[in-house]
Each structure stands twice: as structure tokens, then as C-alpha cells.
A protein has these predicted regions:
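Adenine-nucleotide phosphate-binding core of ATP-dependent small-molecule kinases
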Residues: 26, 163-202, 209, 220-222
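Glycine-rich phosphate-binding loop plus the immediately following alpha-helix
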Residues: 94-96, 100-103, 107-110, 134-176, ...
Length: 249
């Protein structure tokens, strides 16, 4: 059994994989991660735990206390891993959630793609058909954009709006603007990839805001639940110890 954990700024997502399928997947709010120890204690014991933590070192210490006894690997971004290569100037500075998502996307689709994680932040990363991470960008996520505008501009409505091509209410205008800004960043990255010789890149998108963005994108979209967990599983499978651990289950 492999337990994969994606510790983000808003949610801690986890999944237990038995080598053939996900036996369980769920999440808790990062602010309520004290519940995680009791939740994980009810699961079958894993042989290996693989973690992508972007919630900070203090949270990482708390997470360690919640983990069951097992070999544990804390992911670090590197120059090359699991079939992809990083063009980041300093590979170790790339967020481990982005690195895991890139690995997961390439293992699932093996094609040129804009790899998007729509969470608190929106990460938009370029992946070539031969597995090179060319670079990427980070912008505020839809909810963060919306809240920042409402909290820093006098007189704007607090009501959450809906998407519209031609918004005729302030709440709708804010929501539509945030969604269009996000989609514009994604589609622009796809165009950069095409200009670099990567024909018709996919958009592989995951995260809590993915369902808001996917219908508005003028790209071939692959919506993937828990892409970071898929990447962590790929990393576990590519690790010799992890392969032996999975075979024992």
C-alpha cells in the first residue's frame, strides 16, 4: 500500500493505493489537519508514504505527528524524475505540488500540455511532448482574485457572482473577470507552447477551481481529480522500494 499526501495551503488531500486502484481518497481543511491522525489511523497500514507539502515547515512538523508508522518520502523537486526533465533555473525552488502534477500529467497523457492546478493559487505550467517542463507561471486563483478585489475596493458587493459572457451585476462582473483572467493565462501559455513547436497542447487541469475554468477554455481539456496524488503515485512506482512495497500488498 502507498499513501500519497498533497498538503496544500487550503486542503490536505490524501489517497491510499493498493497497486491496482485507489482504495480511498479524501481531504481535510489544512486548518483542521489535527483530524488527520484519527482519519489515517482507520486505514489499512501503508508500506510507503509519499508527501508533497507546500503548506510550510511548521505544518510539516504537525503532519509528521499525524502519520502512521511507515517509510516516508518527502518530495523534493529535482532536475529529472519519472520521465520528465525540468528547465527551471533552480529546480529545487519549484513547488513540489507543481512538480508532482507535471509528473502525473505526463504519465497519464504523454503529450504536450499546459498543466494547471487551480487552487488558492493558479499554476500554469508548460510541458513538451518529450517530457520537458519548459517553465510556468503563478497567478492568484479565482477565489483569491475575487476576495482581493472585494476586500480592497470600496463599495463592491460581497455576494459571490456567477460567470456570464456579458455580466450585468457587480458580483457577476467580478466572478467573470476572475475566470476570464485565469483562462486567458492558460490559453496564452498554450499559444506559447504552439509557437515553440508543440502542436495542439492539451490542458490538463486539476484543483478545487478546475470545474469553474474547464467549460470556458478554448482548448482540449483533460479534467483530472487529484493530479498531484497521481504524480506522487507515479514517483512511488518509479522508486525501487515502493515497487517492492506495492508488490507485497
Amino acid at each position: 500500500m502507498v499513501l500519497a499526501i498533497d498538503a496544500g495551503n487550503t486542503r490536505v488531500k490524501w489517497g491510499l493505493h493498493d497497486g491496482a486502484r485507489w482504495r480511498a481518497r479524501a481531504w481535510v481543511a489544512t486548518a483542521q489537519a489535527g483530524r488527520l491522525k484519527a482519519v489515517l489511523a482507520r486505514l489499512p497500514a501503508p508500506e510507503l508514504i509519499v508527501i508533497a507539502n507546500v503548506a510550510g515547515s511548521v505544518f510539516g512538523d504537525k503532519l509528521r505527528q499525524a502519520l502512521p508508522a511507515a517509510a516516508t518520502r518527502w518530495l523534493k523537486s529535482t532536475r529529472a524524475q519519472a520521465g520528465i526533465r525540468s528547465s527551471y533555473a533552480t529546480p529545487a525552488q519549484l513547488g513540489v505540488d507543481r512538480w508532482a502534477a507535471l509528473i502525473g500529467a505526463y504519465r497519464l497523457f504523454g503529450a504536450a500540455a499546459v498543466v494547471v492546478n487551480a487552487g488558492t493559487a493558479l499554476t500554469v505550467d508548460a510541458l513538451t511532448a518529450d517530457g520537458v517542463f519548459a517553465g510556468g507561471m503563478i497567478v492568484p486563483g479565482v477565489e483569491l482574485m475575487r476576495k482581493a478585489l472585494q476586500e480592497n475596493t470600496a463599495g463592491l458587493q460581497r455576494r459571490t457572482g456567477k460567470f456570464s459572457f456579458f455580466p450585468d451585476a457587480t458580483g457577476d462582473a467580478i466572478m467573470s473577470g476572475a475566470i476570464n483572467a485565469s483562462c486567458g493565462a492558460i490559453e496564452r501559455m498554450a499559444r506559447f507552447l504552439e509557437d515553440a513547436g508543440q502542436a495542439a497542447p492539451l490542458c490538463v487541469i486539476s484543483g478545487g477551481g478546475a470545474a469553474l475554468l474547464a467549460p470556458q477554455l478554448n482548448l482540449e481539456v483533460k479534467l483530472v481529480d487529484n493530479l498531484v496524488l497521481e504524480g506522487l503515485l507515479t514517483i512511488a512506482r518509479d522508486d525501487g522500494f515502493a515497487a517492492r512495497a506495492i508488490q507485497k500488498t
